[in-house]
């Protein structure tokens, strides 16, 4: 199964509370943090919610 590499590129300080919670759920705390998650619909939905704060790329 492929994986997603998710990197936070913008701060979550001046965002909606649910966006901050989504960043925390993904395991992102500060700009430049990167996590590797399985490519599942749940994670893609979270990334879609905060797409203006993160970048995503597929890795094997």
Curated annotation (Swiss-Prot):
SUPFAM superfamilies with a match to the protein in the record: Ribosomal protein L30p/L7e
Superkingdom of origin: Bacteria
UniProt-listed Pfam families: Ribosomal_L30
Example of a GO biological process term: translation
GO CC entries: cytosolic large ribosomal subunit
A molecular-function term among this protein's GO annotations: structural constituent of ribosome
Quaternary state and interactors: Part of the 50S ribosomal subunit.
Record protein name field: Large ribosomal subunit protein uL30
Species the sequence originates in: Cutibacterium acnes (strain DSM 16379 / KPA171202) (Propionibacterium acnes)
